[in-house]
UniProtKB/Swiss-Prot annotation:
Gene Ontology MF terms: metal ion binding
Main location: membrane
Keyword Membrane: yes
Name listed for the protein in its UniProt record: Uncharacterized protein RP014
Organism: Rickettsia prowazekii (strain Madrid E)
The keyword Metal-binding belongs to this UniProt entry's keyword annotation: no
PANTHER family per UniProt: HIGH-AFFINITY ZINC UPTAKE SYSTEM PROTEIN ZNUA-RELATED
Amino acid sequence: MKTNMLTNNCKDKIFIKKSHTILRLLYFFKSLAMILFFIFFSLTSYAKPKIVVSITPISSILAMLVKDKVDIESLAVNNECPHHHNIKPSDITKVRNADMVIYINEQFDGFTEKLISNNNQNIIKISDIKSLTTIKNNWHIWLDLNNAKILLQEFAQIFIKNFPQLQKEINNNLPIALKELNKLQDIKNNEFRTIKDIILLSDSSEYFFLNTNIKTAKLYRESQKSLRYISKLEELIKGSNNKCIVLSNKQKSQLYTKLNAKTKIIILNSENWNVKNINSNTFQDQYLQMINQVKKCIH
């Protein structure tokens, strides 16, 4: 009888031990599950949105608004006209992994439309923003600082709606960014105050001279080598005060070296910007470079 009692007692102790072990294991797995849940929640909550933008000037305006809270990648990273961008395999990967894609329209950066045709991301088409000042068949809109301000304000609304976790950051950055653009406008007006007129040979520069007191003559031609074209250009230079012609960086300045010796040839970086690491100062830096390029018309 004593033996049976001892046996039962041992069984009870073993059962209790097993129960405690099971409870400990359950508690361990419950704690582990909670830890993994919080890690996953933290990673998903604080993961930066991935935004793909067709060209660097638009990327740089966006960076003023979101700074380092968003991963921004540009597709066309060069000084060339976006019309001629050749799609690369890396572009396809960028778009596929993006939370949002921003481009201008099929006419300007149409390569982006090909990339987004089979994707379901949020697509922002800038030409749909009706408050922008636009020139027919010309979409270098960022060179007009008033347009840059409109883009900042439109992007602010879009990003707060799609990424509400960025609202505080955007609300803090927007007024600062608008002030920076106002400063650029003041610098531009001050530096250009003695420039009376210029001659534009590329429509890509046209937006840059909106809202200034500079009179602009425009001579846009596909072929810039004909005698008629050169004759017309010489006539415009003769009647000009500053005798300053403005080309885009895709045009060949060598064609104009035999013009009037007093003619100043300005090559303006107006097509796109070859900047790989976009940050919140990129737009101001690039725009100031363009102001300094045009200042050569004075001397």
